[in-house]
């Protein structure tokens, strides 16, 4: 339950981050087949699929609870996750007749450092090219 709440909180922070940068939010937590897209946004004429990763830890190194360092939020976007997001994005675009639109995949990593009472947001635009097998 804590994990779900933290994920939703991270997604809300990422959404506000995107809005402040001029993105128009098109969808939140969009389910496409078995996949889910955290955020779908429009940055000028480009459809942006944003994968959000949230981590909470005691220190600046991004260590998780219990001192377990999992590499921070961006390290959680594995090759399989990239493929899953790309597959869901393909379905999302096809369902809306938008397969010819420019597309980008961003990752927003959010880390809460409790010892420092600091929230860090890291945005990686064009973080991956659409997965290893699924591109438009």
Give the positions of each predicted feature.
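Domain-level recognition of nuclease-like catalytic cores that cleave nucleotide substrates
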Residues: 94-136
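Hydrophobic residues on conserved beta-strands that form the core of alpha/beta folds
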Residues: 25-27, 49, 105
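Short acidic/glycine-enriched loop/turn segments that link adjacent beta-strands
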Residues: 32-35
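Conserved catalytic cores of phosphodiester-cleaving nucleases, focusing on short active-site segments
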Residues: 18, 37-62, 77, 85
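A solvent-exposed, charged loop/short amphipathic helix patch at secondary-structure junctions
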Residues: 63-67
């Amino acid at each position: 339950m804590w994990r779900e709440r933290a994920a939703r909180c991270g997604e809300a922070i990422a959404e506000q981050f995107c809005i402040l940068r001029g993105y128009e939010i098109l969808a939140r937590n969009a389910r496409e087949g078995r996949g889910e897209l955290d955020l779908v946004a429009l940055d000028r004429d480009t459809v942006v699929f944003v994968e959000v990763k949230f981590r909470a830890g005691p220190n600046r190194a991004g260590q998780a609870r219990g001192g377990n360092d999992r590499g921070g939020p961006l390290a959680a976007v594995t090759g399989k996750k990239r493929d899953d997001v790309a597959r869901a994005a393909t379905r999302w675009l096809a369902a809306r007749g938008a397969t010819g639109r420019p597309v980008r995949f961003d990752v927003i990593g959010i880390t809460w450092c409790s010892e420092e009472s600091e929230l860090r947001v890291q945005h990686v635009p064009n973080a991956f090219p659409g997965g290893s097998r699924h591109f438009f």
